[in-house]
Amino acid sequence: MSLGEINENVKLAREYALLGNYSSAVVCYQGVLEQIKKYLYSVRDSSLQQKWQQVWQEINEETKQVREIMTTLESFQMESTPSKPSSFAQDNDIMPVHVEHRSSPCVVRKSSVPYKDSKGHGNRLSVGPRGQARPSPRVANGDKGKPQKSKEKKENPSKPKEDKNKAEAVETEVKRFDRGGEDKDLIDALERDIISQNPNVTWDDIADLEEAKKLLKEAVVLPMWMPEFFKGIRRPWKGVLMVGPPGTGKTLLAKAVATECRTTFFNVSSSTLTSKYRGESEKLVRLLFEMARFYAPTTIFIDEIDSICSRRGTSEEHEASRRVKAELLVQMDGVGGTSENDPSKMVMVLAATNFPWDIDEALRRRLEKRIYIPLPSAKGRVDLLKINLKELDLANDVNMDKIAEQMEGYSGADITNVCRDASLMAMRRRIEGLTPEEIRNLPKDEMHMPTTMEDFETALKKVSKSVSAADLEKYEKWIAEFGSC
């Protein structure tokens, strides 16, 4: 995809709109908006991003105008059949022009007047070149067609402005990975795993875990800000493994990395790198890392990495699975060479697992930083309660410190479940014993009752912790032996 293609697609969309083929114009406009979105993700310069965002807004405004025209025309079509008798009676001065148009060679094939009226806007491509014949469908519809014409004229002056903005924005080709040949489908599949939309999770949305956030900033953010410092022995970390029980915020940390760090972010799972065809899974792994180096700086997030690269040499291991693991290990070892000389071209693998003891030893060595994501501390539990309850009305008797004390041993996901259950208690009390019709007629104010301390105590009795003490002991033992914080 090049800037020339974007420009041509914009021209094509406007030509369709001017000729009255609005459905095709909308399709072209949508394609242009998607192309600009993809290009925006590859732009690193903030001023350049603002210009392209302005271009996107203007193109989007044109699309809305074309949609409004389509809606107006559809309403005309719906009204055309019932309004026909009254139009003969009231619009006598317009009908002679309509009859003259029927004698035109281009429209003589039409079987009836209502059919021609309903299709008039779709025939402009064939009628347009005949000069005087083109405006006749608008005259046939009376004055309703005039605002439509003025909208098309308004779009025309904006065209030079759009082209000027595009020319000033960037004059280079759009950066896109392309190896051609039979790998194109595999590349397209991997490109779908590039997160182009903001997950909207910031560091402040994650309670506690200060050490983990500090390490991730050091591994991803600081090398971008201080490339001269992170060289040689101080090169950026090429692999980080997050270990911990379920529901402690490992995936949430990855979302924060995608939001806060201006790097290309690949979200990869076992389904992404698995194929039923022999040799294709290894090829997907190789292409993933080639694309990562091409779009560098890049972060590859592999969730539940134990499902992809479990321990080799076991009796349950399949030969195809072993080949995929070998390719992944080879590619990860090759990642470091691309970032040692230029930290801005780094590729970092960020992995998460609930079963660190099942991971292959060679992969454990390549994931240089192995950090423990523990259950929330007392302060972390209070912070989590504040984050989860910030949109709720709380009664005066709610004591968050006391609630946090009763939640010792709960994971972050468990605390969220308690808050969700407590927030529904008032609604459950209000609708108890009511019929469905009475529930539908309840005022909204009565549904938004403050959440009380009693609601939290009831929710705590219903929601138990999901992590056992034996599991915590296993994690702590593993991190004490293999951890690298």
Swiss-Prot record:
Compositionally skewed regions (Basic and acidic residues) per UniProt: 141-173
GO annotation terms (biological process): axon extension; cell division; cytoplasmic microtubule organization; microtubule severing
Alphabetical list of SMART domains matching this protein: AAA
Residues covered by region (Disordered): 101-173
Pfam families given in the database record: AAA, AAA_lid_3, KATNA1_MIT, Vps4_C
Intracellular or extracellular location(s): Cytoplasm; Cytoplasm, Cytoskeleton, Microtubule organizing center, Centrosome; Cytoplasm, Cytoskeleton, Spindle pole; Cytoplasm, Cytoskeleton, Spindle
One CC-aspect GO term: microtubule cytoskeleton
EC nos: 5.6.1.1
Residues noted as binding ATP in the record, renumbered to the chain: G244, P245, P246, G247, T248, G249, K250, T251
InterPro entries documented for this protein: AAA+_ATPase (IPR003593), AAA_lid_3 (IPR041569), ATPase_AAA_core (IPR003959), ATPase_AAA_CS (IPR003960), KATNA1 (IPR028596), KATNA1_MIT (IPR048611), KTNA1_AAA_dom (IPR048612), MT-severing_AAA_ATPase (IPR050304)
Single Gene Ontology MF annotation: microtubule binding
UniProt name for this protein: Katanin p60 ATPase-containing subunit A1
Organism classification: Eukaryota, Metazoa, Chordata, Craniata, Vertebrata
Gene: katna1
